[in-house]
């Protein structure tokens, strides 16, 4: 079950791992640039997601100390659905894995305020049928928009609005919307 205590413990674990393994991750895992944890939810669902990022290190459309860049985000998530098959208190746990290219408008030094958006692909451990939201396929597109702030010590705190949908591949396709808080540490 997702609780405040579990979220705090997960954030602490990611922070400890990131701080102790930063140079190892950068060298041994093909130059990963950061790790993140996200937590939040939507209508009768709570989500915790862990991810790793690889920056593109691009400077497109540079002006006024900002530019467009981005990163690859590989993630795995735990979803706790609380109204499975539209039955009150019928719970189901799901695993979700995904990959998303994310475009970020950021400062040239990669610090301070940013805005980002991404559209990726995800696979659910089973077809989502929580409340009146049915997605009909295990494959889903995952798009988001978000804002955040990167501190000088490489910690990044942000918020996102995430939408999952199969893009009309199969009906019904009710879509699932989530509000998420994200904490990341850059190596």
Residue ranges and their predicted role:
Residues 35-41, 72-78, 117-121, 159-163:
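Transmembrane beta-barrel strands of outer-membrane/channel proteins
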């Amino acid at each position: 079950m997702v609780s405040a205590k579990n979220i705090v413990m997960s954030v602490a674990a990611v922070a400890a791992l990131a701080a102790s393994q930063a140079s190892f991750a950068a060298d041994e895992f093909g130059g990963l640039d950061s790790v993140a944890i996200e937590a939040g939810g939507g209508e009768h669902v709570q989500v915790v997601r862990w991810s790793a990022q690889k920056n593109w290190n691009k400077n497109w459309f540079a002006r006024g100390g900002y530019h467009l860049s981005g990163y690859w985000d590989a993630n795995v998530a735990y979803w706790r659905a609380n109204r499975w098959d539209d039955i009150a208190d019928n719970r189901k746990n799901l695993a979700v894995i995904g990959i998303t290219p994310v475009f970020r408008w950021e400062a040239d030094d990669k610090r301070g305020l940013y805005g980002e958006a991404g559209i990726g692909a995800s696979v659910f451990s089973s077809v989502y049928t929580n409340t009146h939201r049915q997605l009909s396929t295990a494959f889903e597109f995952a798009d988001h928009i978000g804002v955040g702030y990167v501190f000088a010590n490489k910690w990044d705190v942000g918020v996102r609005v995430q939408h999952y949908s199969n893009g009309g591949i199969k009906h019904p396709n009710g879509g699932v919307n989530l509000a998420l808080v994200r904490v990341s540490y850059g190596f």
